[in-house]
């Protein structure tokens, strides 16, 4: 897990933003790309380069593959309504996203780890698939046997993030109710995710 977390901070530096809003992210002090020539700064990007960079923000923020991200966008595009909000709603309904934004875990990676180790239930049934789509009214809960896991204790002590309005979190019970699909403006991103550029990227 330490290796994964260190790698994610390199991702932040490569993108030039504090993607997860963490105080210890190295991009806060070194606002240039990693590597031998990183100190030379960022190159000026073409329109496609900007779109591609925005796509990478979402890919890394949600810790999913390019294939999964593209599939999510295509599903959102086919639905009625504003494509960007459909896209965000689909990403935020992932079980790993709900758990991460509950504030019970410090990172999206730790959320995925808890889920894969069968420490998480949805409506009292164990679900070990991070991409599971949570529905409005569903209750996500961390099982009691996992309550003493260090990353949960750390997150509770630091309280770096509060649950957004579309989630109803109970820190004592380690449970969170998914109320509704959010719009882009409601998600507590710590960086400008430029969702409009992602729409352009997949609409080429």
Curated annotation (Swiss-Prot):
GO cellular component terms given for this protein: small ribosomal subunit
InterPro entries referenced in this protein's UniProt entry, alphabetically: Ribosomal_uS4 (IPR022801), Ribosomal_uS4_bac-type (IPR005709), Ribosomal_uS4_N (IPR001912), S4_RNA-bd (IPR002942), S4_RNA-bd_sf (IPR036986)
Keyword Ribonucleoprotein: yes
Keyword annotations: Ribonucleoprotein, Ribosomal protein, RNA-binding, rRNA-binding
Record bears the keyword Cell division: no
SUPFAM superfamilies cross-referenced by the UniProt entry: Alpha-L RNA-binding motif (SSF55174)
Organism superkingdom: Bacteria
GO MF annotations in UniProt: rRNA binding; structural constituent of ribosome
GO biological process: ribosomal small subunit biogenesis; translation
Domain S4 RNA-binding: 93-156
Role of this protein: One of the primary rRNA binding proteins, it binds directly to 16S rRNA where it nucleates assembly of the body of the 30S subunit. With S5 and S12 plays an important role in translational accuracy.
SUBUNIT field: Part of the 30S ribosomal subunit. Contacts protein S5. The interaction surface between S4 and S5 is involved in control of translational fidelity.
Family: Belongs to the universal ribosomal protein uS4 family.
PANTHER family given in the database record: 30S 40S RIBOSOMAL PROTEIN, SMALL RIBOSOMAL SUBUNIT PROTEIN US4M
NCBIfam families per UniProt: PRK05327.1, rpsD_bact
Protein name as catalogued: Small ribosomal subunit protein uS4
Species of provenance: Wolbachia pipientis subsp. Culex pipiens (strain wPip)
This protein's encoding gene: rpsD
């Amino acid at each position: 897990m330490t290796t994964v977390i260190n790698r994610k901070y390199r991702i932040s530096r490569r993108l030039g933003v504090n993607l997860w809003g963490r105080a210890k992210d190295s991009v806060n002090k070194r606002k240039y790309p990693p590597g031998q020539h990183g100190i030379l700064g960022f190159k000026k990007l073409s329109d496609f380069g900007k779109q591609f960079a925005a796509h990478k923000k979402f890919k890394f923020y949600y810790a999913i593959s390019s294939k999964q991200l593209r599939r999510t966008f295509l599903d959102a595009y086919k639905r009625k309504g504003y494509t960007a909000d459909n896209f965000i709603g689909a990403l935020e309904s992932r079980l790993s996203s709900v758990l991460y934004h509950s504030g019970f875990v410090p990172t999206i990676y730790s959320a995925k780890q808890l889920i894969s180790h069968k420490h998480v239930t949805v409506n009292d049934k164990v679900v070990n698939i991070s991409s599971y789509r949570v529905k409005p009214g569903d209750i996500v809960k961390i099982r009691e046997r996992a309550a003493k896991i260090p990353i949960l204790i750390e997150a509770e002590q630091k309280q770096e993030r509060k649950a957004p309005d579309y989630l109803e979190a109970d820190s004592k019970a380690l449970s969170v109710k998914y109320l509704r699909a959010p719009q882009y403006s409601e998600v507590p991103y710590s960086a400008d995710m430029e969702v409009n550029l992602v729409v352009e990227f997949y609409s080429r």
